[in-house]
């Protein structure tokens, strides 16, 4: 029974030792110098927070041409950047240099370099090529002497060496052979001792008796970090410079205005952060292992995908080669046919010329015919022969080869193809689309339009994302509503919430993947549901002076000849007429919104609403007036009625003339341009591209807005005791265009439903 327990205890101890050994071996890569790939020896902390051995740093600076900036390796150190090398106690003690001589040595070694004069106005900045971050790090003028030693890293390296070394006990350096195992160390004496030797070399009552014993070690370090500038113990930490400083550094102008905290506070804060971070990592080991498995799977997928990409490229290039080979064969066949045709013609021409030689062919036959003495027979035979001889004579006099020997017409121009082949490269993802803000707007629905930048790779389809910005943010990442595989360069968002702000963005996709998102565009939706109506010119509209479009969404006032003829009857004044157009839909409840565009060249146009009964009563057969101050809105904007009347006005209009909006001096209740004591001072604002009218039937209020930015222009009270309809008044020439609902546009769009997939 006891043997079983002992075996179990031994097994657990061995398992613990194996785990410790494995952990230390896995940690070894953190203790290797990036230059020499060996354990750190007197590591220095670079400004980039990476570490490097002092000897390696000195060697690297020497290779870079910075001579004299690495310190004197034979001198005894007096700064954190240099420390005494391990010295055997049996060797004779080296004479320490005097402090003043050492100071001069350090200044000469660390403060000058070839090519610089002492006291130069612009000292050289030493750059150290950090092997870890692959960048140049500024060391300042002092070089390595301005760096701190990483004593903590030294201690970790020492503990690691002791843990992995088998039978590597540290021996007493003062014992006679054979030495005993050391039990103490002395940083002042820089030696290790057994118990007897420590008592012998630290006798009671002497100054050495005050030396504090440490654990035995082969590498002795300073007790603490010293300021490289003032040789004082560092006591504070500068958060701005992220550097340890002493009391003297703290009051220097270099750290003026910096956030400086005691080392104890910085120590506690960093220790707490490191402890929490380490605890989080240790508490999520399963997550780490899962991510490692995911990365390994990604590596395998990368290998497979890379091989597939290679095969695909090879197949495509082979396809190009096959097309080129087929084209080469067809071109060579065309050249061959042309060559044979030319050779045939030239051979026939040679045969004809050979027949002209003496005694052969045509010439020989002609010579024999000339021997004929019978005249009728000669005439019969010589007639046809003479024609052939005449043609041969003409060909002989105007000799020219029957075919050209040049094949210049068969030259290939492959410049464009060579350029295409040279520029042949992997397909890139589409660039970020550019949203067309001139065509993108929100009305009854949201219409989004975009385009790709010039020279952008094509996009097969797009992804449109949108969300409301005026809702409380939910914890976690921002959630977007998404519509994928959108064809074309426009999209339609149906049923948006009224009085909201939407942010939208687009990105393209092709075979190479998804591109970058476009810049976000913010759109304000109308404050109320959009009212759909058409223009009705049956009430108060003169067909001679008003022209309504076929779709009944636009109207133009044309004064024309009838107005001029009517004006001839008047001896004085300016003859004007008021024409009105109403909407064919009346509002009896709720809130409604619509928008229109007024021609900036209009003389005087009034846009607004009114009680349907009052509008028909006032404008049916409306008389011509002789004053431009005549106003049909029962007091609004004109001062025609007593302002003291408490009853709500039946009309509310916004006056537009010559590209300006005429407003009164009141605040939000700019219902008219006159006050109780007389005409009020009026002001004008520029006419926006579109005007919006929002009617709140229950509250009896109507608001006029800039339909682009939804900035309020005017708010008026209104009598809503009956049906209220839109109204447009014209004095002189002018034009109004109702904003067409997005859903009726003939342009091809992609509809995005109100319930889209969440990201």
From Swiss-Prot:
Stretches annotated zinc finger (B box-type): 222-263
Pfam family, one: zf-B_box
Domain named B30.2/SPRY: residues: 513-747
Protein name, UniProt field: Tripartite motif-containing protein 46
Main location group: other
Keyword Oxidoreductase tagged: no
Protein source organism: Rattus norvegicus
Domain Fibronectin type-III stretches: 429-528
Gene Ontology cellular component list: axon cytoplasm; axon initial segment; cytoskeleton; main axon; proximal neuron projection
Ranges annotated as RING-type zinc finger: 33-59, 172-231
Gene: Trim46
Gene3D superfamilies hit by this protein: 1.20.5.170, 2.60.120.920, 4.10.830.40, Classic Zinc Finger, Immunoglobulins, Zinc/RING finger domain, C3HC4 (zinc finger)
Chain intervals for the UniProt region annotation (Required for microtubule association, proximal axon localization and axon formation): 411-429
Record PTM Phosphoserine, positions in chain: 330, 627
Database matches in InterPro entries: B30.2/SPRY, B30.2/SPRY_sf, ConA-like_dom_sf, COS_domain, E3_ligase_FN3/SPRY, FN3_dom, FN3_sf, Ig-like_fold
Residues that coordinate or bind Zn(2+): 227, 230, 249, 255
Biological process according to GO: anterograde synaptic vesicle transport; axonogenesis; microtubule bundle formation; microtubule cytoskeleton organization; negative regulation of axon extension; neuron migration; positive regulation of anterograde dense core granule transport; protein localization to axon
Region Disordered, residue ranges: 67-98
Protein purpose: Microtubule-associated protein that is involved in the formation of parallel microtubule bundles linked by cross-bridges in the proximal axon. Required for the uniform orientation and maintenance of the parallel microtubule fascicles, which are important for efficient cargo delivery and trafficking in axons. Thereby also required for proper axon specification, the establishment of neuronal polarity and proper neuronal migration.
Compositionally biased tracts (Low complexity): 73-89
Entry keywords, A to Z: Cell projection, Coiled coil, Cytoplasm, Cytoskeleton, Metal-binding, Phosphoprotein, Repeat, Zinc, Zinc-finger
Region (Required for proximal axon localization, axon formation and migration): 1-166
Summary of subunit composition and partner proteins: Interacts with TUBB3 and TUBA4A.
Entry's localization field: Cell projection, Axon; Cytoplasm, Cytoskeleton
Ranges for domain COS: 370-427
Positions in coiled-coil regions: 294-400
Expression tissues: Expressed in primary hippocampal and cortical neurons.
